[in-house]
């Protein structure tokens, strides 16, 4: 069953209007965006007696530039909350996505605040890659007149925790910037740290920037701000799972599911390139195993966010059980005085390796101890939703949303283990069962505003998902632009995801070219990056014709391998060295012609 949305919460723009608005504002500076914001306010309120929000006179007061560098939306939410805090304090603030920021103006910034996440192997979020490269290049200016603060979001289950924030913080200081505050590194449960940091930032900036009269306050926002919905990460839609179909062969080593979710009459809107956030329930069997290993019953009362719940319920719905971290291992070892785990304490590399290879339940099984229920809860991290690239376009499927789910399953000493969200969707939600979802908008992975622009799509494995959405959208609009797909997986007969659909697009002319890489169908392993090199001359022709390049999939290896291949193609066929090719690719990124959705 779905919960209907109030009409006032529906998105006021259709996808076409949204695309035109994004195209029109792509090249504007923060100051120009501020003027446009005031202009539209004036259009809407021509005779109102209220004071319009207009830019402060240049030179009268230093503005605060607030840069949001977000991958999954958390950094953006923190930045937007800080913007609201600064406005409430009557401070002059400009909020801008890192991807929209004209980074060559950074030398003129007086007060700079960056909120950033980290992705992959310690890399900046996609929208901040160009800014990061610029600051670490020889072109970076001195920032002796800039005062700055950095808030960094990360995940301690990854080795390079908060590395992007550390990079920005150290480089800004190295370039001569003055720290307003020490950098804060926040884990998955970031809300309390963010709230405290925001209050400190406001206090510090009050002493550095004169308080503005309401008529002087400037508030500009990222393009993300135009998305409105009553359904959010904290208030998800109760939707219905309508289709769960395995789309890999019976002999495939992979279990990949095509999932369709009915949004009903909720009015929830999304665009190709967006992600679907899915809240999930931990496997009750896993909860039972963990509870029994600790000689508990599951009915013990525990406190979660100020509420009292039975232990089993808290573990099923509120805490992460399928991803271990070095901090959890270290804290469990210290708490239980485990003889097998204590030698790992203080050794970061060993802790990381153990956490990556040993799920929480098996850590407990291998190092049995007796914990009370609240001690167990205090050891764990809060459950967070999983994000899946959307594999459909509403222009075709209307009130549905489709995702492509690779089911995580493996074995630990004969015991079956599985990913929390993927096994929930694949095995524990029945058709017509309830799934709590929300849309995570991603304006950094969008089709070209001009429908005649050629598109190159590189998506091995489940990375093919957003390109199914891209093709549905382009087919529904009847666009004339050329489309080229690079896809790879182990075997043609077992792992060609959405094979019939791609063959239909080729037959009907919607898909101009398709190059397939099957890594296990021959002695020599072939991957999508090999196909890119093989088609280098034609690929360069497409790029010269203005093609937009999109990459989706694994951030740890594939994305880097694909980027290396692209650089080699650009260097060879563009007649330049690798350093120049890297600058060329960076320019494509700035122009939104090279976009990645990697995880």
UniProtKB/Swiss-Prot annotation:
GO terms for cellular component: cytosol. InterPro entries: CysJ, CysJ-like_FAD-binding, CysJ_Proteobact, FAD-bd_FR_type, Flavdoxin-like, Flavodoxin/NO_synth, Flavoprot_Pyr_Nucl_cyt_Rdtase, Flavoprotein-like_sf. FAD binds at residues 322, 356, 386-389, 404-406, 410, 419-422, 599. It catalyses: hydrogen sulfide + 3 NADP(+) + 3 H2O = sulfite + 3 NADPH + 4 H(+). Gene3D superfamilies: 3.40.50.360, NADPH-cytochrome p450 Reductase, Chain A, domain 3, Nucleotide-binding domain of ferredoxin-NADP reductase (FNR) module, Translation factors. CDD domains: SiR. Residues 234-448 form the FAD-binding FR-type domain. It comes from the Bacteria. FMN binds at residues 70-75, 117-120, 153-162. One of its GO terms (molecular function) is flavin adenine dinucleotide binding. Binds 1 FAD per subunit. Belongs to the NADPH-dependent sulphite reductase flavoprotein subunit CysJ family. In the N-terminal section; belongs to the flavodoxin family. Component of the sulfite reductase complex that catalyzes the 6-electron reduction of sulfite to sulfide. This is one of several activities required for the biosynthesis of L-cysteine from sulfate. The flavoprotein component catalyzes the electron flow from NADPH -> FAD -> FMN to the hemoprotein component. Alpha(8)-beta(8). The alpha component is a flavoprotein, the beta component is a hemoprotein. This is Sulfite reductase [NADPH] flavoprotein alpha-component.
